[in-house]
């Protein structure tokens, strides 16, 4: 976790948000394990874990997790399907992502 990330969290009080962190990658991916981003219930984010369709899929999953009041969720994002190729995201890898709800 970098300094900006910690400062961002410390400036928020009485907020519920999700932290999405890449646990593991396989093949070519835009970001590697350990990269995190914050997702708010309204879908706004702080940070990035790769951009594009993959990041949007993770963002939507985090918003869903928050709305269901889950404590955590693990998802896998595959970056080599037809949609990814059409959007120019031809990394060809996959990311395992941990989404954890935080009350700060």
Q: Where in the sequence are the language-model features?
A:
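Segments forming oxygen-rich coordination pockets for charged ligands
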Residues: 1-104
């Amino acid at each position: 976790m970098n300094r900006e990330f910690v400062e961002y969290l410390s400036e928020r009080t009485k907020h519920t948000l999700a932290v999405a962190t890449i646990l593991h990658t396989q093949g070519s991916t835009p970001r590697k394990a350990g990269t995190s981003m914050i997702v708010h219930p309204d879908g706004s984010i702080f940070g990035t874990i790769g951009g594009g369709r993959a990041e949007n899929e993770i963002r939507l999953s985090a918003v869903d997790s928050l709305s269901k009041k889950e404590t955590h969720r693990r998802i896998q994002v595959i970056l080599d399907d037809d949609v990814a190729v059409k959007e120019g995201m031809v990394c060809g890898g996959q990311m395992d992502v941990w989404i954890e709800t935080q009350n700060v």
